[in-house]
Amino acid sequence: MNIYAVGGAIRDELLGVPVQDRDYVVVGATPEQMTAQGFRAVGKDFPVFLHPQTQEEYALARTERKTAAGYHGFQFHYAPDVTLDEDLARRDLTINAMAREVSPEGALVGPVIDPFDGQADLRARVFRHVSDAFVEDPVRILRIARFAARFADFTVADETLALMRRMVDAGEVDALVPERVWQEIARGLMEAKPSRMFAVLRDCGALARILPEVDALWGVPQRADYHPEVDTGVHVMMVVDYAAKQGYSLAVRFAALTHDLGKGTTPADVLPRHVGHESRSVELLKPLCERLRVPNECRDLALVVAREHGNLHRVMEMGAAALVRLFERSDALRKPARFAELLQACESDARGRLGLDAQPYPQAERLRVALAAARSVDAGAIARGIGNDTEKIKEAVHRARIQAVAQALAIGE
């Protein structure tokens, strides 16, 4: 048998970037031979084995054939006579269809095996499909978009983009399971330049199918005095990229992506104003999160950001009572860590505007000071002093928090 390192490990090595994952293909072996050497079988649809020491994945060389629509509609063939080139031919992109042999000691040996000119496409910074079999797996559209967010200086080859559009038109994207869509979107959001992912998805038409609420934002004008970039879609991409540049969490980046969804449904006769877009954003966001089965942590933060971001931008004008009501609505008193992420998302919103990425955002520090003051109130002591009257306790704690915030900020109640 012969073992080869394949795919992303070879690509990243040639690009000079850290290798994130190592995948191996075994040519000329049977499942029985693998288990005899201590490998543990874990593959469900085709033979994949874990190395007895490293726990890295080793897959038997295979070919695949489309048998039904969607991500799972494949039939796999594996046998000792399946060649390395045949295995590489089933891969999505030329830059992912390269290999190097692995010595018995685990070292990469020999030249790069590159039957589809992946090295040339790496030099040209191009995503190009290996074969027309690309159209058989709709996940590949999402993968290319995610790779674009990681390798922001790459472009999609014209012929590959044409195939992607054909797939979208044929309804292949509609067959994707929600969990896989979310998985790829989430991974793309965590890359260095998430806006590139959405640019590719828009270009091939897939964004309108998987995230129509986001796709609707392009071409919607905003007031130029607040938003020099004018276009809402452009603004949202700047917000997401700012959050990524700061290294913020997935929850913050998702909130950045969805905070202005309501602007996509603003009546044309009131543009470029967007009165009430916050509540419309919330109403659009709820079914989106349900449809894609977005994790609770991401959904909950996104809903708070969508509802409250306009209020946070205006906190310099608020009195202590309004600030305490904001803390209570956003559950900041019980969940200060989530409130810190709310601040990050709103700061990203303020700075995700043309020419304003370094603009001060004093609202964040004001809110941090105010929240610390509100949380310093000893609600238990107040309750013990009042007794069993729940409403009186609630009102007294509320008043004490207002007074604490007013004192901390030296402002009126």
From Swiss-Prot:
Which residues are involved in binding Mg(2+)?
Answer: 21, 23
State the SUPFAM superfamilies in the record. Nucleotidyltransferase, Poly A polymerase C-terminal region-like
Q: What GO molecular function annotations does the UniProt record carry, in alphabetical order? A: ATP binding; CCA tRNA nucleotidyltransferase activity; cyclic-nucleotide phosphodiesterase activity; magnesium ion binding; phosphatase activity; tRNA binding
Q: From the Swiss-Prot or TrEMBL record, give the protein name.
A: Multifunctional CCA protein
Q: Name one GO biological process term.
A: tRNA 3'-terminal CCA addition
Q: Which domain of life is it from?
A: Bacteria
Quaternary structure and partners: Monomer. Can also form homodimers and oligomers.
Q: Which residues form the signal peptide?
A: none
EC number per UniProt: 2.7.7.72, 3.1.3.-, 3.1.4.-
**Native organism:** Burkholderia cenocepacia (strain HI2424)
Q: Which reaction does it catalyse?
A: a tRNA precursor + 2 CTP + ATP = a tRNA with a 3' CCA end + 3 diphosphate; a tRNA with a 3' CCA end + 2 CTP + ATP = a tRNA with a 3' CCACCA end + 3 diphosphate
Q: Which PROSITE patterns match?
A: HD
Say what the protein does: Catalyzes the addition and repair of the essential 3'-terminal CCA sequence in tRNAs without using a nucleic acid template. Adds these three nucleotides in the order of C, C, and A to the tRNA nucleotide-73, using CTP and ATP as substrates and producing inorganic pyrophosphate. tRNA 3'-terminal CCA addition is required both for tRNA processing and repair. Also involved in tRNA surveillance by mediating tandem CCA addition to generate a CCACCA at the 3' terminus of unstable tRNAs. While stable tRNAs receive only 3'-terminal CCA, unstable tRNAs are marked with CCACCA and rapidly degraded.
What's this protein's family per the entry?
A: Belongs to the tRNA nucleotidyltransferase/poly(A) polymerase family. Bacterial CCA-adding enzyme type 1 subfamily.
List ligand-binding residues for CTP.
8, 11, 91, 143, 146
